[in-house]
Design a protein with these regions (language model features):
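Extracytoplasmic metal-acquisition and chelation regions
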Residues: 1-185
């Protein structure tokens, strides 16, 4: 708690890449740095960067189209919430069991009740969990409301199966587009 007269610090979310728009900035900075460090390879880096940025533009357009055509703009997470940049980029509202990527492992009864009431009152069809989660909180909300439990992948951890299948950022974020489409309609 801040002392009277002190400003509360804003919630910090290090998951900047959950917004494809931010991912573009990251990719460009990496490319620029590689071009400086390896001038003979600069043409290849620039070509690969241009191709990847085009894919990120397409991903951004897909997210925008889903949100623009959505019946609602509210996401519910029975889990941590590493999607602040995604939510801000597309004007989405969210409610989560834990702030950001809190180290808390048990949500309060009041938080659980609030999320159940929110899902029920707004007829929200999906409750999200993040990758490598135990999904307990999302399952609890689902059992109380009938909402479906889906993964929204923050792209900072990857399962062994996804790794072996060669899945990368674009694949995981494309899966997120489809999960968001279901959640917002």
């Amino acid at each position: 708690e801040p002392a009277p007269g002190e400003a509360e610090e804003p919630e910090y979310d290090e998951h900047v890449w959950t917004s494809p728009r931010n991912a573009k900035l990251i990719v460009q900075k990496i490319s620029d740095t590689l071009c400086e460090a390896d001038a003979p390879g600069a043409d290849a880096y620039k070509a690969n960067t241009a191709a990847y940025l085009a894919q990120l533009d397409q991903l951004d357009a897909e997210f925008k189209a889903v949100v623009d055509g959505a019946a609602r703009r509210t996401m519910v997470f029975g889990d941590r919430f590493p999607f602040r940049y995604l939510a801000d980029a597309y004007g989405l509202d969210y409610f989560a069991a834990f702030p950001g990527c809190s180290t808390e492992t048990e949500a309060s009864a009041a938080t659980v009740k609030f999320l159940i009431d929110k899902v029920s009152a707004e007829h929200i069809p999906v409750v999200f969990h993040i990758e490598l989660s135990n999904e307990k909180m999302a399952d609890t909300i689902s059992e109380a409301t009938g909402a479906k439990v889906l993964l929204l992948h923050a792209c900072h951890n990857i399962s062994r199966d996804d790794f072996l299948a060669g899945k990368g950022y674009l694949d995981l974020m494309t899966d997120n587009v489809e999960a968001l489409r279901e959640a917002l309609n």
